[in-house]
Amino acid sequence: LWAQWYIGLMVPPLMLALLTQEKALDVSPEHFHAEFHETGRVACFWVDVCEDKNATPHSPQQRMETLISQALVPVVQALEATGEINGKLIWSNTGYLINWYLTEMKQLLGEATVESLRHALFFEKTLTNGEDNPLWRTVVLRDGLLVRRTCCQRYRLPDVQQCGDCTLK
């Protein structure tokens, strides 16, 4: 759950900044600082606000790809290197989170932008720079809805039940 707490706290505000502001926020890891809760999970972040002059002229898709490659890939690689969690599970949960937040942002961004981002993020095997897209097929179309492709595994934790939309049902 640590990875879900960390990424779940970090991604929505970064998406909001990257997709709604004229100037792109530099999302390089050195600009992020975290404070931890007594339980060990991240309690809050603060960010050194700096413009990424290279990303400022980018499209929403390219800005999201910057979020993936600069902010998320290093975190997922570090967590996977511990040997405690599989990176594919982290990406699966991250895809689900991003898809949910795109729905929340639909009024701000417009339906066309949200659908374009969903297509690029979840249905393209590679990013525009040619790298593998770690979010590819983390959510899939089922019965007309985008849903998580694989179980998040939360049900394995003590005192935690299956999610309402668990793929194991």
Predicted regions and their residues:
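Hydrophobic, aromatic-lined core segments that form the binding pocket/scaffold
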Residues: 1-142
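Local cysteine-cluster metal-coordination motifs and their immediate loop/turn environment
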Residues: 149-169
